Amino acid sequence: MLICYKPMGKNDKERGDNVAEKNVKELDFERKHEEDLQRLRGFRLLDDDFMSKVFEDKECTKFLLQIILNRTDLKVITVHGQHDIKNLQGRSVRLDILAVDVEGRVYNIEIQRSDKGAEVKRARYNSSLIDANVTEPGEKYENLCESYVIFITENDIMKAGLPIYHIDRTVKETGELFGDESHIIYVNSQIKDESALGKLMHDFYCTDPKDMNYKILAERVRYFKEDEKGVATMCRVMEDMRNETAREERIAMAQRLLKLGKLSYEEIAETAVLTVEEVKALDEKGIA
């Protein structure tokens, strides 16, 4: 039998290449999606990106604050996860949770797995930036709102074996409170006893909502781990995290190349996959 093969034309080759490229992209997407699902199953409230999504819910944040502050009269009116505060004159910050209650009090809640990330001067810095960003030009100092910076830490940062530490300025000579309404709190997640706070810290370590003590938190965790819409939301969050990490790596590469001083802005932009304007801005910032 004589079998004749039609010679492959240019268009046929291009179509074949496109199909192959599409298949590779689909396989890569499926691999990343499966990795995301596996990672999502292991998330706990002690993971800041997951915690930020869970506590974007006002009722969950109210519940959290009521236990930490031992108050039942607190009502949250706004809450934002992964909230950026810009500082044009210095270092900007991204807050895990920023909430405001009905009385105008401001709450910054941070999850810190590493001791370095929970150092005391970071708490001070967060507090100062919050003060600077909630005031308007010309506003009277007495109108400055009461603020709380709360660190929930994986380790006992204060090394005293206590479940919670309250830090407020005092007058050294009299021992009386200074009364500036600026509060810093460290919560030691290592203590998971039968107190309300201990049960809350137990829930922060759970990967399975069935193991959690508090229904309000378990339902929110279950939504992001098991509900189709919740899972899709978390997958988008993880994709954004990958993109942000990749961009940070490109910026770091550009900064290293600028430091070497051997390439033009255009060459650095092409190598680091940034715009020429972005490279120039990085250089000007480095000089400043």
Show the residue positions of the predicted features.
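Pocket-edge structural micro-motifs
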Residues: 151-154, 188-189, 225
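Accessory alpha/beta interaction modules
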Residues: 1-183, 193-195
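Short, charged alpha-helical interaction segments and adjacent helix-coil junctions
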Residues: 2-41, 45, 49, 68, ...
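Low-complexity, glycine/alanine/valine/leucine- and proline-rich hydrophobic stretches
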Residues: 171-180, 188-190, 200, 204-207
